[in-house]
Structures are given as structure tokens and as C-alpha cells.
A protein has these predicted regions:
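Residue-level signal for the membrane-embedded core of alpha-helical transmembrane segments
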Residues: 32-37, 88
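Juxtamembrane membrane-water interface segments that cap and precede transmembrane helices
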Residues: 1-23, 132-148
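Generic structural signal for secondary-structure transition and capping sites
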Residues: 5-6, 29, 47
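Membrane-interface loop-to-helix entry segments
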Residues: 24, 28-31
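Terminal, non-globular segments
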Residues: 39-43
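Generic alpha-helical segment signature
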Residues: 2, 17, 35, 58-62
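Membrane-embedded architecture of ER/inner-membrane glycosylation machinery
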Residues: 44-171
């Protein structure tokens, strides 16, 4: 166990070489569609000393940055290495919703926009699913369209975009 982890940290294993900035886009995509709240949560981390009972945001930011720095330093990089940081990201996103101001409203509008974009992407799946060509899964594209999963995703993302827009307007 230790040898295998040390090997992945110090040398590239299975051609999983990625640039040093690899986990930046992974963090952005992993937080979708609430990426604006993650950005807002990170921007609102107090840069000064706060009492321990109010330090959850600093703790979550340190946790997220520690995982980011640790796996950025590793030679082998995979998107799944980001998983230990997801609870910290969730805390930062949740804490970003606690203070009502124009930045929070911006984050809501941007998140709803991302949900709407995802709905459009799923509705357009007949256009892009055919581009998926993987020799190990030759029937993935027709199977994916035939399963109805992308249509259900399109429907649910559309529903979420409309419902959250109505709620935001009524606030």
C-alpha cells in the first residue's frame, strides 16, 4: 500500500501525467453547477484571526487548499484524487449561501445559468453523443441515446433551471 502510493506520488504511473494546474479545472467541473458558490466561498474566507467557533470557513479553505497542493505536487494525477477535497468544497459552497448580498445573488444567477446550460447540452445530445468514439466501448453512443438517460437529465435540469429561476425572482 505504502510503496504503491509513494510510487504514484514520485513518478508517473500508467501515463497519467498531467500539468501542474490540472486540479484547477477539476475543481471547477466537480463543483458544477454550484461553482460560483465555491468561488464566492473561497473569496469570503476571513484573512484575519477569528474565534474558533467562527473558523469553519477557514478550516474548510485550508482543507481544500491542502488537498489541492498535495495532489498538485504528485507526479501522477487523476480526477478522482480530488475526492478528499469535496467535503471541504461543499462546506465552502454552503457557507457562501449564508450572507445575503449582491455577490450571493450573482452566485445564484450564475448557478442557475449553469443549470440551464447543462439542460441545453443534454437536449442537444443527439448532436454531440455521436462524437464519442471509444474502441473499448463501441456501442456507447447509441446505447446512451437509447437508454433515455440523457433525455431524463435534460428534463430534470430544465425543471431545476425553471424552478430555481422562479424561486430567485420571488426572493
Amino acid at each position: 500500500f505504502g510503496y504503491h502510493n509513494l510510487q504514484r506520488f514520485t513518478s508517473v504511473v500508467n501515463d497519467h501525467l498531467q500539468p501542474w494546474w490540472f486540479f484547477g479545472p477539476v475543481m471547477v467541473v466537480a463543483a458544477l453547477p454550484f461553482t460560483p458558490f465555491l468561488i464566492l466561498g473561497l473569496a469570503r474566507v476571513p484573512r484575519w484571526r477569528v474565534p474558533p467557533e467562527h473558523s469553519l470557513q477557514q478550516f474548510a479553505a485550508c482543507w481544500l487548499v491542502a488537498v489541492l497542493l498535495l495532489f498538485t505536487a504528485a507526479a501522477t494525477k487523476l480526477p478522482s484524487y480530488w475526492l478528499p477535497a469535496t467535503p471541504a468544497a461543499a462546506l465552502l459552497m454552503a457557507l457562501a449561501t449564508t450572507r445575503r448580498d449582491r455577490w450571493q445573488r450573482w452566485a445564484w444567477v450564475a448557478s442557475i445559468g449553469l443549470v440551464a446550460c447543462l439542460a441545453v447540452i443534454f437536449w442537444l445530445s443527439p448532436v454531440w453523443v455521436g462524437w464519442i468514439r471509444d474502441p473499448e466501448m463501441p456501442s456507447l453512443a447509441p446505447d446512451l441515446l437509447g437508454s433515455g438517460l440523457v433525455w431524463r437529465a435534460a428534463l430534470w435540469f430544465s425543471f431545476a433551471a425553471v424552478l430555481s429561476s422562479v424561486v430567485l425572482i420571488q426572493r
